[in-house]
Structure formats: structure tokens, C-alpha cells
């Protein structure tokens, strides 16, 4: 499982995770710097990029001597200075590959920092997305189906207690479990599902449905919101079948599942 952390400065991680912030940063495969106004972040990025050796020359001249002495000395300089980082123009980025040490052909490479500028600078979206996508639409209007939208990560939690052999380690693991218990999310009630469906209607997520389907959905939501009239399971099933938006369909399926459970408890009174 991969995560993308989008930050304005490293201090945001430190504020949320305190002492674990350093470990989180160190475990990130790539650090992509676009722009920041935080001095500590700029300094850290500049330091992470590394240093280079610069050979300097100095001469000792005298009017009374014909032999001028030239001395050389080695100085250490940042590969990219904090001042340069603070003055990035739009499109420039600095890539630090902390853990990724292979090129596109899977060959081993040294993870030198990459400064993307001029020809390799980051383009605007209209410069390359316009050929494949309608950029006039808002990103929220694009229906992207996802199988794990409603995934509860606690369902994937694995208890390692049976795998630990060392008694001391097992005791420490139990202690850590007790101090940081896994909290299961409470099941969503009908009010939350109805509220979510109303929000999707306001976003016009069902605009591709027929006018009749749109009206039936709105009426069903209004009946519950104003008079607490529970939707009929047949009506919800019909809307699921004719809904074109996957997100709306997912919420309707949750609503149907909850209505069936209530129907069983009340002995079929919900549909009457």
C-alpha cells in the first residue's frame, strides 16, 4: 500500500506525529519539493540534496616580487542553496530519491538529486491533458469507481500475537495493544446515508439519469427528510438498477441493506 503525503512544510508532520515525524520522513521513497516558505523545510531539503567540493584559488601578489604565489583550497558548498530553493519559478521541482535506486530499465543507479527545470519542468495541466481529457470539467465531476472507497482498514488488521515466540516481546506487544486499541468504526445510520445522497444530488452526480429517475430519487429523499417516511425497498432497488453514478449507487446499496435489516426487526412494517 502506497501513500502520497502532500505538505506545505515538514512542520505539519511534526505537529501531527511529534517524535515519529522523523521516522515517517525517512521512510518516504521520494521527496518532491515544489515550493515552500518555511525556512526549516527549505534548509532540510537543501541539506538532503547534498554537497559538492569547489576548488578555490587565491594569489599573493607583491610589487617588489616577480614570483606570485597561487594557493588552492577546497571548499564545501551545497549542491542547491536554500536561496535557490526559495526562488523556484513555476514548474521547477527538486526530486530526492532516498530509497529508489533504479532507473526505468531497472538498472542500479546512484540516487543523485534531480533538478527539473526548463525542458524538464512540470507542465501545466492544459499543456498535456487537453488532448486526452476535457479540462473544462471540475475534477469532482469525474466519476471514478473504486472498490475500496468504503474500506475500513481495521477489517484488515492482523493480530501478530500468535507469531511471536519470545515471551518478553509478546508481553511488550500485548502492552502496546492495550495502550493503542484498534477502534472499529461505528456502522453508518440511515440519516447519514440520506445526508450523503442529498449531497450527491446537489453535486448533480445523477445528471446522466433520466428525468423520471432524478425526480423519484429527490422525492424519496424529501419524504424522509421532511416527514421521516422510510423509503420502500422496491423503490431503492429500482433506483440502484437505473442509477448511472457508482458513488450514488454505492450509497443506495447501503441504504437498501439497512432497510432490509430494519424490515426484519420490525416484521415487514417498513415497506407498508
From Swiss-Prot:
Superkingdom of this protein's organism: Bacteria
Keywords: Plasmid
Annotated Pfam families: TraG-D_C (PF12696)
Database matches in InterPro entries: P-loop_NTPase, TraG-D_C
Protein name in the entry: Uncharacterized protein pXO2-15/BXB0014/GBAA_pXO2_0014
Amino acid at each position: 500500500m502506497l501513500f502520497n503525503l502532500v505538505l506545505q512544510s515538514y512542520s505539519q508532520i511534526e505537529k501531527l506525529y511529534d517524535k515519529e515525524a522523523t521516522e515517517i520522513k525517512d521512510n518516504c521513497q521520494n521527496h518532491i519539493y515544489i515550493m515552500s516558505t518555511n525556512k526549516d523545510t527549505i534548509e532540510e531539503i537543501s541539506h538532503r540534496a547534498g554537497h559538492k567540493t569547489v576548488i578555490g584559488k587565491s594569489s599573493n601578489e607583491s610589487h617588489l616580487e616577480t614570483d606570485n604565489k597561487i594557493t588552492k583550497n577546497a571548499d564545501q558548498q551545497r549542491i542547491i542553496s536554500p536561496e535557490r530553493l526559495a526562488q523556484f519559478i513555476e514548474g521547477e521541482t527538486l526530486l530526492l530519491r532516498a530509497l529508489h535506486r533504479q532507473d526505468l530499465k531497472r538498472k542500479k543507479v546512484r540516487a543523485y538529486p534531480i533538478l527539473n527545470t526548463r525542458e524538464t519542468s512540470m507542465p501545466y495541466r492544459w499543456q498535456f491533458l487537453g488532448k486526452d481529457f476535457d479540462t473544462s470539467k471540475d475534477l469532482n465531476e469525474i466519476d471514478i469507481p473504486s472498490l475500496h472507497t468504503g474500506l475500513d482498514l481495521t477489517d484488515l488488521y492482523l493480530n501478530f500475537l500468535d507469531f511471536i515466540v519470545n515471551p518478553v516481546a509478546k508481553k511488550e506487544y500485548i502492552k502496546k495493544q492495550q495502550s493503542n486499541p484498534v477502534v472499529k468504526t461505528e456502522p453508518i445510520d440511515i440519516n447519514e446515508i440520506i445526508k450523503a445522497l442529498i449531497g450527491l444530488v446537489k453535486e448533480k452526480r445523477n445528471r446522466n439519469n433520466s428525468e423520471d429517475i432524478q425526480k423519484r430519487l429527490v422525492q424519496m429523499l424529501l419524504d424522509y427528510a421532511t416527514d421521516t417516511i422510510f423509503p420502500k425497498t422496491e423503490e431503492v432497488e429500482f433506483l440502484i438498477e437505473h442509477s448511472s453514478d457508482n458513488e450514488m449507487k454505492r450509497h443506495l446499496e447501503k441504504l437498501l441493506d439497512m432497510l432490509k435489516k430494519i424490515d426484519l426487526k420490525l416484521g415487514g412494517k417498513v415497506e407498508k
